[in-house]
């Protein structure tokens, strides 16, 4: 048996296990929205039917002197069921690959901010583009092969004005490109606007 055949057989077996465990539910859902659009609340409702959920917070570790950010975190925590487990990590690829329970990732925007810092993008350190590509590809590979239900929340960054700073434009471009590729491998892509949910078409534009 060739390596390709072995990988295909393993993938089919994993898919069969997933179907037996979770039925024909959508496995990978991408929820997009602007600030205060209701995207996180919607994502939490999508996962409410699962008895055990791992909530993944992939953003930078907040400083202790930011009360506004602490209040946002407290609001999110208060909404989540007590039996949900929270994991704070920037290693999304490993988290997705090793997942045995449904995952809610909130959000890809804060993860991109963290990764840009990790790879030295803000300081334009030598080789940061290559390191960034590696981190993105690792996550995208894990997302593509995911075998537990996953809802990923992300910011829709393509509808506003062009950011005034170079760092803002870099963030917008990286996250926009990531959203496009995550959506291409998702079973469902949903846009939340003013608390209303729009189910986007299944076919991507060429």
Where are these regions (language model features)?
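A short, flexible beta-alpha/helix-coil linker loop
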Residues: 60-61, 110, 158-160
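Phosphate-binding P-loop
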Residues: 18-26
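Portal/gating segments that form or line small-molecule/metal binding sites
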Residues: 79-119, 125-135, 143-144
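Residue-level signal for inorganic ion chemistry
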Residues: 43, 76, 104, 155, ...
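Small-residue hotspots
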Residues: 9, 15-16
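Conserved P-loop
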Residues: 29-98
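Short, well-ordered beta-strand core segments
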Residues: 53, 103, 188-191
């Amino acid at each position: 048996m060739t390596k390709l055949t072995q990988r295909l057989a393993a993938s089919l077996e994993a898919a069969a296990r997933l179907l037996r465990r979770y039925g024909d539910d959508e496995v990978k859902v991408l929820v997009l929205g602007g600030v205060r659009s209701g995207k996180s609340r919607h994502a939490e409702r999508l996962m409410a039917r699962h008895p055990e959920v791992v909530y993944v917070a992939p953003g930078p570790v907040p400083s202790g002197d930011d009360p506004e950010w602490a209040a946002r975190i407290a609001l999110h925590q208060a909404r989540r069921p007590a039996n949900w487990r929270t994991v704070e990590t920037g290693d999304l690829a490993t988290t997705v690959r090793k997942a045995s329970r449904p995952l809610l990732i909130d959000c890809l925007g804060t993860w991109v901010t963290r990764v840009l810092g990790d790879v030295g993008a803000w300081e334009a350190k030598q080789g940061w583009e290559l390191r960034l590509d590696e981190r993105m590809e690792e996550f995208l590979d894990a997302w593509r092969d995911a075998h537990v239900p996953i809802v990923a929340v992300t910011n829709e960054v393509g509808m506003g004005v062009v950011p005034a700073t170079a760092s803002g434009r870099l963030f917008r471009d990286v996250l926009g490109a990531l959203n496009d590729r995550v959506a291409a491998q998702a079973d469902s892509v949903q846009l939340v606007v003013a608390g209303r949910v729009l189910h986007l078409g299944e076919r991507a534009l060429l």
